[in-house]
């Protein structure tokens, strides 16, 4: 059986609210850490979310 190319990652808010999104990414094509601008409902603003590992 082949190794899966998609992995689950956690996108953690840089506003230090503890809010996060869980998404998937292709580990072969996106080798660097993912950053996205998404909505954080705790601070009610769009902030940058950075990739962390799911424990």
From Swiss-Prot:
InterPro entries: Ribosomal_bL33, Ribosomal_bL33_CS, Ribosomal_bL33_sf, Ribosomal_zn-bd. One of its GO terms (biological process) is translation. GO terms for cellular component: cytosolic large ribosomal subunit. GO terms for molecular function: structural constituent of ribosome. Keywords: Ribonucleoprotein, Ribosomal protein. It comes from the Bacteria. Pfam families: Ribosomal_L33. Belongs to the bacterial ribosomal protein bL33 family. This is Large ribosomal subunit protein bL33. The lineage of its organism: Bacteria, Pseudomonadati, Pseudomonadota, Alphaproteobacteria, Hyphomicrobiales.
